[in-house]
A protein has these predicted regions:
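Active-site-adjacent beta->alpha loops and helix N-cap segments on the catalytic face
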Residues: 65-68, 90-108, 120-125, 146-169, ...
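Glycine-rich phosphate/ribose-binding loops and adjacent secondary-structure elements
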Residues: 159-161, 165-283
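C-terminal extensions of enzymes
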Residues: 1-13, 277-333
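Acidic (Asp/Glu)-rich catalytic clusters
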Residues: 44-48, 72-79, 101-109, 127-135, ...
């Protein structure tokens, strides 16, 4: 089976041991100041304005199955006017005949599109991705633990910092440094800022686990690392001091509009969904997913109204209570 198809197969099977969003309770408002139709969902990040605060995050490509998922979700994104980010463009660079990425642009004129490349790649690979897909921005993903567990993974990482610096110097579209489900520490964000990165997708634990995926692909020797990393809520709590200095995108374990709003309350500029969208693509028609996503927009407005927040910025004024391991983490940072 194609490696990308194996990723899809095991991503669909995985269920996290816990979700940090369940450790967070928002304090509601009974007498709001705004009507529902006054609630503004728009957000700004990576030098772009988006009408809605959530998007379809990087997932797949590089196989027939990946192509069909990209095709379906790109159509959903276009019809719903939300952002769609492809998986790593490396697959297309390795195989010139691969059209699993091109199809999203070709079939969806005006699509809000981002794409993705690994930090192990030379900046010229990023330039090619930008040239081919003409995205609004380029994600640079860092996937250290995946590489370490992956049977055929890289063991050489000392060029990543230099590669990121060269991306910053040479790529003409905005850049986002992205984790892949293990979370991003304040030290990593500060290092990225020093290298010139302005936007970070912290992609915490709680959703897709590439440790689990690579364990299932291999001999499962490292199953004790399946829950490696920091949860999404823990990452956001740990990055409170960075919220006003850089742009933080939240992803990892986001299941529905309440999780989206919780991430925005903690200071995220926007929220990405991967595993949730993958499951929707696997189990629903394009029309059904469009209906679900359009409903999410209204549900986000409803929750914001119940929190007396007219816009995403005002969500940061919402009080909340933490429980369990997430509360313990918050007391020790």
């Amino acid at each position: 089976m194609n490696r990308k198809d194996e990723h899809i197969k095991y991503a669909l099977k995985y269920e996290s041991a816990g979700n940090s969003f369940d450790d967070m309770e928002l304090i509601q408002c009974s007498i709001p100041e705004y009507n529902l139709d006054e609630i503004d969902l728009s957000v700004n990040f990576a030098e772009n304005t988006f009408e809605y605060p959530f998007f379809i995050n990087a997932m797949t490509g590089g196989s027939k199955k990946g192509k069909e998922i990209n095709r379906k979700l790109a159509k959903v994104a276009k019809e719903c006017n939300i952002l769609f980010v492809t998986g790593s463009y490396s697959a297309a660079l390795k195989n010139p005949d691969d059209d699993s990425f091109e199809v999203v642009r070709k079939e969806n004129k005006g699509l809000l599109l981002g794409t993705n490349i690994g930090a192990d790649k030379n900046y010229t690979a990023g330039m090619k991705a930008v040239e081919d897909l003409k995205p609004l921005f380029l994600q640079i993903h860092v996937n250290l633990m995946q590489e370490l567990i992956m049977p055929e993974g890289s063991r050489n990482f000392n060029e990543w910092e230099k590669n990121i610096l060269n991306f910053v110097k040479n790529i003409k579209v905005p850049l986002i440094l992205k984790e892949i489900g293990f979370g991003m520490s304040p030290e990593t964000v500060k290092k990225g800022m020093e290298l010139g990165i302005k936007t970070f997708d912290i992609s915490g634990r709680g959703g897709t686990s590439f440790a689990y995926i690579e364990n299932m692909r291999g001999e499962n020797r490292f199953s004790y690392l399946n829950e490696w990393g920091q949860s999404t809520v823990s990452c956001l709590l740990g990055l409170k001091d960075c919220i006003d200095k850089t742009e933080i995108i939240a992803s990892g374990g986001v299941r529905h509009p309440l999780d989206i709003i919780k991430a925005l309350v903690l200071g995220a500029k926007a929220v990405g969904l991967s595993g949730t969208m993958l499951r929707l693509a696997e189990n629903n028609s394009t029309e059904e997913i469009i209906e679900i996503v359009n409903s999410w927009k209204e549900e986000c407005r409803m929750i914001m109204c119940a929190l007396n927040a007219k816009n995403v910025k005002e969500l940061q004024n919402v009080k909340y209570v933490l429980y369990g391991k997430t509360r313990e983490f918050s007391l020790n940072i």
